């Protein structure tokens, strides 16, 4: 490798230059797929498309609170913890250190999908789990339920969590009392002692919590034997993948930008970073290896559970979107709240993530409308505000300024090219591109793989 020569004499640094050559680190780039709204945008479908020729598909954050649905050969597979790209028999699936793993949930999910079709045959041979990933225990899930109950009793409203133990396990992680995959597979005796301490801590915080410590450990020992062959040093694995022969590496974000612990509509968020920064911290890789960042955007907006939702349509429009879009959560089965597309929210998500292109999904759900509204600005006390408010009370008070566009009022589900879309549907897509200054790469007009129109 030839290095560019440096000349210490002409250095612009105040103390001269050490004379070492400076080169930008090379290696493969990862392609990232992230949710740009409140989740349920159709990330699984975009990942499924990209995973067809990928070598490695990764999850970097969250747990089995996420829900992705992928349809292959008319079989519908549901994923919560496993990267949905594992459905490709040539893919290595990697669960990074930022993911929290509920072992019974992992095996149950795999077994359910194995029974549905051939997509998951031999999954254990193609899954790698970072040894630094934290473990979700049953008592984390039980505590999650108790916390929700307490919030309901004390404040009259809960956070609407999935009760999968996500908040409690990330709390244990931050409090440095959590247990990781490396603890489980390295020394079960030491792991058992630390498990007992953590379980007893939880029992003292939640007196109604019942934990069968010995029974749990017995089960965990069984899981340990099954999981051990899959556990590897995740940092080393990914470094080798990035710096070895050319590979297509895909990162499948869970949840979405507005559910991010830092940038989402706090406190009605998840407990991890589901923006692009979570890719680096959740996999153990530097930012210069991040390549394309695809934002997945539903053609309208949905949200599960409570929290501010400026463009929500609590009326016939919202009901029509809910019914036509079959808007029920994959993980909880809860009805999703529905509203018009919100470009203020998307501009904010773009500021954080730097999307290189968008996938616009479920455009066909808007087929019935003669006119379609798009939120283009927020007003507070009659004045347009230039930012997305952090405070939930403020966000609840904003008045949305809409742009009304003509609908197409025709079935677009059989369109396979952009030109086959009605002119008003084309204009809707172009309007979004112009307002956000991000190109739309895919348009979803139905459930199947074939119904994703690729523009470039």
UniProtKB/Swiss-Prot annotation:
Belongs to the adenylosuccinate synthetase family. Its EC number is 6.3.4.4. It comes from Bos taurus (Bovine). It is an enzyme of class 6 (ligase). It catalyses: IMP + L-aspartate + GTP = N(6)-(1,2-dicarboxyethyl)-AMP + GDP + phosphate + 2 H(+). Coiled coil: none annotated. Residues 1-26 are annotated as: Disordered. NCBIfam families: PRK01117.1, purA. This is Adenylosuccinate synthetase isozyme 2. IMP binds at residues 40-43, 65-68, 162, 176, 255, 270, 334. The active site is at residues 40, 68. It comes from the Eukaryota.
């Amino acid at each position: 490798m030839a290095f560019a020569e440096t000349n210490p004499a002409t250095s612009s640094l105040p103390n001269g230059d050490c004379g070492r050559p400076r080169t930008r680190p090379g290696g493969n780039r990862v392609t990232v797929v992230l949710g740009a709204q409140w989740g349920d945008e159709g990330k699984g479908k975009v990942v499924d498309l990209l995973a067809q020729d990928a070598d490695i598909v990764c999850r970097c954050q969250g747990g089995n609170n996420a829900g992705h649905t992928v349809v292959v050969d008319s079989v519908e597979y549901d994923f919560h913890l496993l990267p949905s790209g594992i459905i490709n028999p040539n893919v290595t699936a990697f669960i990074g250190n930022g993911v929290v793993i509920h072992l019974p949930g992992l095996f149950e999910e795999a077994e359910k999908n194995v029974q549905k079709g051939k997509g998951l045959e031999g999954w254990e041979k193609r899954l790698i789990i970072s040894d630094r990933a934290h473990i979700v225990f049953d008592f984390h899930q039980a505590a999650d339920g108790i916390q929700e109950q307490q919030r309901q009793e004390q404040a009259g409203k809960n956070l609407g969590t999935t009760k999968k133990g996500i908040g409690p396990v990330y709390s244990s992680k931050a409090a440095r009392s959590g247990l990781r995959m490396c603890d489980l597979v390295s020394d079960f005796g030491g792991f058992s002692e630390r498990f007992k301490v953590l379980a007893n801590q939880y029992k003292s915080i939640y007196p109604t919590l019942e934990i069968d410590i010995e029974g749990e450990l017995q089960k965990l020992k069984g899981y340990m034997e099954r999981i051990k062959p899959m556990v590897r040093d995740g940092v080393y694995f990914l470094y080798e993948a990035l710096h070895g022969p050319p590979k297509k590496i895909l990162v499948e974000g869970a949840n979405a930008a507005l559910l991010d612990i830092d940038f989402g509509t706090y406190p009605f968020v998840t407990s991890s970073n589901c923006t692009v920064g979570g890719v680096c911290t959740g996999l153990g890789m530097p930012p210069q290896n991040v390549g394309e960042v695809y934002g997945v955007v539903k053609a309208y907006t949905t949200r599960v559970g409570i929290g501010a939702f400026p463009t929500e349509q609590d009326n016939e429009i919202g009901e029509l979107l809910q019914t036509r879009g079959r808007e029920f959560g994959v993980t909880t089965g809860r009805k999703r709240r529905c509203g018009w597309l919100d470009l203020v929210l998307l501009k904010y998500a773009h500021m954080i993530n730097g999307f290189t292109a968008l996938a616009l999904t479920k455009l066909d759900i808007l087929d019935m409308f003669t006119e379609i509204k798009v939120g283009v600005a927020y007003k507070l006390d009659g004045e347009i505000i230039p930012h997305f408010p952090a405070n939930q009370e403020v966000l609840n008070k904003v008045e949305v300024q809409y742009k009304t566009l003509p609908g197409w009022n025709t079935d677009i589900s059989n369109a396979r090219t952009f030109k086959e879309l009605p002119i008003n549907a084309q204009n809707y897509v172009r309007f979004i591109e112009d307002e956000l200054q991000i190109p739309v790469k895919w348009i979803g007009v139905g459930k199947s793989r074939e119904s994703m129109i690729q523009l470039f």
